[in-house]
Swiss-Prot record:
It catalyses: ATP + H2O = ADP + phosphate + H(+). It comes from Mus musculus (Mouse). One of its GO terms (cellular component) is nuclear replication fork. Residues 853-1005 form the Helicase C-terminal domain. Keywords: Acetylation, ATP-binding, Chromatin regulator, Chromosome, DNA damage, DNA repair, DNA-binding, Helicase, Hydrolase, Isopeptide bond, Nucleotide-binding, Nucleus, Phosphoprotein, Repeat, Ubl conjugation. The gene is Smarcad1. GO terms for molecular function: ATP binding; ATP hydrolysis activity; ATP-dependent chromatin remodeler activity; DNA binding; helicase activity; ubiquitin binding. Residues 7-19 have a biased composition (Basic and acidic residues). This is SWI/SNF-related matrix-associated actin-dependent regulator of chromatin subfamily A containing DEAD/H box 1. The modification Phosphothreonine is found at residue 54. Residues 156-198, 247-290 form the CUE domain.
Amino acid sequence: MNLFNLDRFRFEKRSKIEEAPEAAPQPSQARPSSPISLSAEEENAEGEGSRANTPDSDVTEKTEDSSVPEPPDNERKASLSCFQNQRAIQEYIDLSSDTEDVSPNCSSTVQEKKFSKDTVIIVSEPSEDEESHDLPSVTRRNDSSELEDLSELEDLKDAKLQTLKELFPQRSDSDLLKLIESTSTMDGAIAAALLMFGDAGGGPRKRKLSSSSEEDDVNDDQSVKQPRGDRGEESNESAEASSNWEKQESIVLKLQKEFPNFDKQELREVLKEHEWMYTEALESLKVFAEDQDVQCASQSEVTNGKEVARNQNYSKNATKIKMKQKISVKPQNGFNKKRKKNVFNPKKAVEDSEYDSGSDAGSSLDEDYSSCEEVMEDGYKGKILHFLQVSSIAELTLIPKCSQKKAQKITELRPFNNWEALFTKMSKINGLSEDLIWNCKTVIQERDVVIRLMNKCEDISNKLTKQVTMLTGNGGGWNREQPSLLNQSLSLKPYQKVGLNWLALVHKHGLNGILADEMGLGKTIQAIAFLAYLFQEGNKGPHLIVVPASTIDNWLREVNLWCPSLNVLCYYGSQEERKQIRFNIHNKYEDYNVIVTTYNCAISSSDDRSLFRRLKLNYAIFDEGHMLKNMGSIRYQHLMTINARNRLLLTGTPVQNNLLELMSLLNFVMPHMFSSSTSEIRRMFSSKTKPADEQSIYEKERIAHAKQIIKPFILRRVKEEVLKLLPPKKDRIELCAMSEKQEQLYSGLFNRLKKSINNLEKNTEMCNVMMQLRKMANHPLLHRQYYTPEKLKEMSQLMLKEPTHCEANPDLIFEDMEVMTDFELHVLCKQYQHINSYQLDMDLILDSGKFRALGCILSELKQKGDRVVLFSQFTMMLDILEVLLKHHQHRYLRLDGKTQISERIHLIDEFNTDMDIFVFLLSTKAGGLGINLTSANVVILHDIDCNPYNDKQAEDRCHRVGQTKEVLVIKLISQGTIEESMLKINQQKLKLEQDMTTVDEADEGSMPADIATLLKTSMGL
């Protein structure tokens, strides 16, 4: 804005003042004229329009906040300030802010504070004519309120100073403070600075402000010609903006009551990240509020083996860093209402790196905005040149906007001898551009983030190792004996004592961990022993244990068996039952140390989630922690809001499909360490695994990086290492040739689906081609082949003779039958008398390649005296298997997802005690978790899962602690079908776990071997 425009605004304002009616009473009649009153009026002038139309409820709220009511226009005294017309200046500032990308919290509408009713603040120096005025009539509040106002004033002054420093970086703080003290508003200070210093301080800002001023001149010319009606609309808009600001400030004050340790500016930033949604901001703050009580081992000190007391209250600077690292990270799931396109911005990356400790890779990318070219420092030039020269195609695809084809083109252009040659070659090829070169910086920064995480984790691991070594060397020992609270008739295995000591060690250092022992090694017992240890140390809870529904009875039983001293509350049941439990908890009618609940009950409703957000839990233990492998899922986000000081995951399969799942688990247990780097972790570890012979050097490095990162936080032991006396487990692949009829049906289905794919036909079968092929490979009756449409029409007519269907429509009955499988129709024929003759023959029911093989296998096992646990993915397959077992007169029990939770434990007990029961039928999903079936020694997988770890879970129902016989695992695979491909893929997935857990030649041991070995040494094991 130039001086001419400013003078014109003053002239217009003076004209309005001269035209104003003289009969209006002046404020001086009610109180002495002073610069104080002038400043106060000037401070509140902007919000006048909004207060005129405020409803009664809003007026009441303002009274409670002790805000100053504004006098009407006709009572205002004419101000003599040279910056009267704030509207025009505000337009100028808004335009400049848009151009400069200035944060909204720097604008006056956010930074200005409302002052209480009786407080008068001096914001401008009095003139010589007014210095003689006394101030005896000025009333003040009590000292505490006055201190609060002074604190608010200081915050306001600091915010204004920070804003002016951004706009005028070449000016000293003292000059800018004088401007702030001489004016009452942010707009006035900026306008005064523009008059005194010129447009703004140098560089790109100067050019942008100049262009903004030119645009503002045009807008000023237009504003002179505006009719009064338009100016009235502007006034309404200004009033609306002021009203929005007041609402935002009320939200900030409301949030500050919940978190008094946070500054208002920090709370504003949190609210802006959540689009001023109070409830979402409150939940985010609550998630990380307890993290202030938990410090990373890198931040703690260890002296002579004694625990240094945790610092419960962070300093303000630490809190600010924490807020920016955590709260600013938005959830990566459906909670985001708007998901903006992630476009790499070099300038923003540099600015972000100044405060984000999780992504500040020491950025040396320097943008020169005085010209159109982007200039990059030589350090990054060399890194980018080397990256494009040596990276594989898989690595190049990590570059934003770089597809597989573009990566292939880049490799064909090699070698790149220098920077200029790189630009020349890239610009000549269609589809390639200079943007790919600049975007390489993103990948390099992400790698730097991973390297920093590795270094941080290595420091933690070294401290833990040093601590155990020191304790062992001093002879003090780290041998946490079995807690006395545990049942004295039961004893922990030696390796379980090592697990207990490891849990105690990471707890002492303020870390959270993942107990990832192989299935069947007693993770449940180790967790219960750890809770007993905490109880003896004075930490009596409350603790939370979240488990799958199928294992809740087993957990309750084990806790009562191993540690009856712990008071356990089971949070499970219908909505009404859980409502009563919540009522008892809130009113402290329940006496408990541990709450046991299921994943579904913990997060199924808002009331359930609210309960665990409000409860201040010490430890939250999550059984089958691999259910948290997807950090983008709603379940993951809901469980993250559980208000627990510490977290412990129990999982037998920490690595399943890719390394990202493992990183998701780490982010869950240590959010204050990993949450600031989730985007980098997601990109670096999300690629699929490959066989060892196809892995590039980079992919092997990724596995090494992941091993280094997880080392301090995870304890993983396999049965072969710790259970020397555990009977071995043998795996056997049984290739089953399909029956002649089944092979014909499979070939016909395969050709039909293949033809549909080639013709790009969109039909219902194409929705799940793989599932259709799997079902046919298992049993033909899982499709409808034998019940032709003609048969179904006859059956639908006969159904009208049934008393239950005498008035039914045969066409509708026919439609219902069309979507049923052969076996479902067979069961239907058995239920109704008039269609009983349409039942399938037993030969058709048993006509399956797997059934032929299974019949022979079961006969042999029964003769040997073995007992069998038989798993299937499909409940309908279990129905057909029941027919097979009845036909061969084998006694059996069945458990699947439809079995009531209360009945499951009784079925398990019955099978383990009644040795005459030969087979236990189980669905893989319902019966593969947390069930002890050591009375059986043979596991048959009728059909394998796409996830091999689900099958491993099923196998370990028998191969676990307590097993006395050799365990045989038989997998039935239909020969020449899709199941052979599934088996090959599953073997590749299992290879990833081997890569993560086996000992490399260059390493001293597996992931936690150094710590675990030292613990065993200190315990004399």
